[in-house]
Regions:
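Intrinsically disordered, low-complexity N-terminal extensions of AAA+/P-loop NTPases
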Residues: 1-62
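Interdomain "pre-motor" coupling segment immediately N-terminal to P-loop NTPase/helicase cores
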Residues: 60-116
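Residue-level signature of catalytic and energy-coupling elements of molecular machines
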Residues: 61, 99, 185, 215, ...
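Conserved helicase motor core of P-loop NTPases
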Residues: 119, 245-402, 408-411
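C-terminal accessory regions
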Residues: 417-537
Length: 537
């Protein structure tokens, strides 16, 4: 099937590859013309799914071809679901429909007694805002009010990745030290099964929680959001927080954006959703340097590509630098890396509390973030060059930085956690230290990992660094979007150097992410249905 679709096995996730093979077995029994039509639809759907879309839109003759074989697109055992001209994988359709019903149900729930604020009059509400707009402060205030009102309340706080959870925990510790709460990853909180991705907390075994607060929701895929809501008790209230202008989830769907993008012409039901949503715009306490703040604000609010390109390429300060890319790009990136990390191998010569703290501070002081993994401007290439420049022979060399790429409950490691390799002067050999773990780990205990000196913007999402070097690709790519550019810019707290051409900046700013999803439409339909039922009582 992979060969027929002109897609390599490596480009397909395991579940999609399996789906393609099952489908091939069915279409193999049909006529050649039918095979060609179905193969083309399958290829388009797989590629659309890999781009984050929940469905593809069919032409009339394509819909007719599917309807002529209803076992392909009707019923729970069908591979696909056809709704009008929209063709889904059945799983994506089910997730979208279930999530819409769950969110609408939360919005229809009665207000809690003695509500403190307008934000609390809904069982679920959404807030979005850029860095420094007060998202963590609002979460802290809500936690404080809820605990004072109901000391026995069970509150859970979560984020999609380990790094995002770690930063949220630290932020809440400062904002409300009297009520310390530890944020967990969604997969850990809902007890995800290793390998399958299923949550053990589900409709039959819901999470014991009265209030769930989830941060960095732009990173949550449709599949994860559906499983999360399915794993909640009917009375659990939900708060979703994030920045919907950042990159969307790697998987299909645009959950946060679907809840926050409003059309003035939308029907009455949209007002209920809008009332439950808040976009924070005022900047109260951003850790970002002024020039970075100003450019981030411009990216959020302006759509004039020419004007934005001029601002980005002409801005200059102690905190921001745009360099026209050339042969010196890699050399400049390596020079910056060495200025921050050249002593890292020396610091990692032994494991002490002081050396651990110093090593992680050094690592967080700088990062190279890239649009893609592969190619001359991909993170793999930069990592190879940095390892060589630091005289690190392998990932097991003291001073190497590792990025965990798979959740592992056994070791309490999550996708996105960063470790540093140290010499174990007591027992011999090397160990890997992680900030959130007291005891270092051996290499054989680690889940899959990669080098962490350079990472993709997707991997960096939810993290922050003092200084960032962001090399734009030399050729346009679908990955290069306005959302990716904005996310890269806001990873830097004190300084960012962007290396690229004016053409690549324009290419990024011209492409705004627009995923094919009907989640918002389904939520509004559910709300309208509930309103009609109330009127008929």
């Amino acid at each position: 099937m992979e060969q027929l679709l002109n897609i390599t096995n490596e480009e397909l996730p395991r579940e999609t590859t399996a789906m393609a093979r099952v489908f091939a077995a069915h279409v193999g029994k049909k006529s050649l013309s039918h095979q060609e039509t179905m193969m083309r639809l399958t290829e388009n759907l797989i590629l659309a799914r890999e781009s984050g879309n929940s469905f593809i839109t069919l032409e009339a003759e394509e819909s007719a071809a599917l309807l002529a074989n209803p076992h392909f697109c009707r019923g729970e055992k069908a591979l696909f679901h056809l709704e009008g001209s929209h063709l889904y994988l059945y799983r994506e359709f089910h997730n979208e429909a279930a999530l819409a019903e769950a969110i609408a149900s939360k919005l229809q729930a009665p207000a809690p007694e003695n509500a403190f604020s307008d934000a609390e009059i809904r069982a679920a509400f959404v807030k979005s805002g850029g860095p420094g707009t007060g998202k963590t402060t609002i979460i802290a205030a809500l936690v404080t009010l809820e605990v004072k009102r109901n000391p026995g309340i069970v509150i859970e706080i979560a984020a999609p990745t380990g790094k995002a959870a770690e930063l949220l925990t630290a932020g809440l510790a400062k904002a409300c030290p009297e009520y310390p709460l530890k944020a967990e990853t969604l997969h850990k909180l809902f007890k995800a099964q290793h390998g399958s991705g299923r949550f053990n907390c589900n409709g039959s075994n819901p999470l014991d929680c009265d209030l769930l607060i989830v941060d960095e929701c732009s990173m949550i895929s449709l599949d994860t959001a559906a499983k999360m809501f399915n794993g909640l008790k009917p009375g659990t209230r939900v708060v979703l927080s994030g920045d919907h202008r950042q990159l969307e989830a790697i998987g299909p769907g645009a959950v946060l954006d679907s809840l926050l993008t409003f059309d003035p012409g939308e029907r009455e039901a949209a007002r209920k959703l809008k009332k439950a949503s808040t976009e924070l715009t005022a900047n109260y306490r951003s850790k970002l340097a002024p020039t970075i703040q100003e450019l981030a604000k411009a990216l959020r609010e302006e759509d004039d590509v020419k004007l934005l390109t001029q601002r980005i390429t002409n801005a200059a300060s102690d905190h921001y630098c745009f360099k026209k890319s050339g042969k010196e790009t890699h050399k400049e990136a390596l020079e910056s890396a060495l200025s921050h990390w050249k002593k890292l191998p020396e610091v990692c010569a032994e494991i002490t509390a002081g050396s651990r703290k110093q090593a992680f501070e050094m690592l967080k002081s700088f990062r190279i973030i890239t649009a893609s993994r592969v190619g001359q401007d991909g993170c793999i290439k930069f990592n190879e060059e940095i390892m060589k420049a630091l005289d690190l022979d392998s990932p097991e060399s003291p001073g190497s930085a590792l990025l965990i790429s798979q959740n592992c409950r056994r070791t309490a490691l999550s996708n996105g956690d960063t470790g540093i390799v140290f010499t174990d002067s007591i027992n011999g050999g090397v160990k890997v230290c992680f900030e959130h773990l007291e005891e270092p780990l051996s290499f054989h205990d680690l889940p899959p990992f990669e080098s962490a000196f350079a990472m993709t913007v997707h991997k960096a999402q939810g993290s922050g660094f003092s200084e960032v070097f962001f090399p734009l690709p030399t050729k346009d790519t679908p990955l290069l979007t306005k959302e990716l550019f904005y996310t890269a810019l806001t990873r830097a707290a004190m300084k960012i150097t962007i290396s690229g051409t004016l053409e690549m900046v324009e290419a990024a700013l011209m492409k705004k992410s627009c995923r094919s999803t009907a989640l918002r439409k389904r939520i509004l339909s559910q709300l309208e249905k509930a309103d009609d039922e109330k009127k008929n009582l």
